[in-house]
Amino acid sequence: DAPVLSSRGKYKVGVKTIQVLNPKQIDIINSNKDQTVLYDRPLTLEIWYPALLENDIKEEVVYNQMMGNFSDPKRPLIPFKFKGRASRNAKSNRSDEPYPLIIVSHGYTGSRLMFTYLTENLASKGYVVVSIDHSDSTFNDANKFNSTLLNRSLDDLFVLNQIEKMSFDSSSFLYQLVDANNTALI
């Protein structure tokens, strides 16, 4: 038995992975007092959303994850897979759109897949959930902590703005699906 709030909601869950670039960001690792270096900051986003599934499609997904720290020989990167309860690239359920947005920001070090038990559950309850792989802050690419200090909140704001743009873009799967004015941050 699970506590009441941990049970699944009424919606089936879809999941997609997308890549976005935050242009002209300060590269704090390679900048110095004489020169500010800019770069286009890559971010991988995992997006869970209420979905419509055809009869033969199940909420089954396999996530590829990495644990460890690429720069620490005592904690080598170890790849593994785990199953989740979502359907990859499923059609979105538009019956109750727009859905509130939740942005998930992992710790240092971490990954966008750390809280799938929560992100899938929230999507089943009628939320669009976007989890960010923060560059320089994941198991796979952890770098100096000053990058995390500078970029974490900037990533969160950039992602909020990107999701809002996608909600107005008729070519996006998020078109009219998400209400970015009703957003929570975890």
Residue ranges of model-derived segments:
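Short, solvent-exposed loop/turn and secondary-structure capping segments
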Residues: 30, 57-61, 113-118, 140-144
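Short substrate-entry loop that stabilizes the transition state in hydrolases
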Residues: 83-141
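Generic detector of contiguous secondary-structure segments
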Residues: 2-6, 28-29, 34-36, 141-152, ...
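Domain-level recognition of soluble alpha/beta enzyme cores
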Residues: 1-102
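Short, surface-exposed linear patches
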Residues: 39-42, 66-71, 125-128, 133, ...
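Alpha/beta-hydrolase active-site loop
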Residues: 114, 118-124, 145-186
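Hydrophobic aliphatic residue packing
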Residues: 13, 102, 128-132, 159, ...
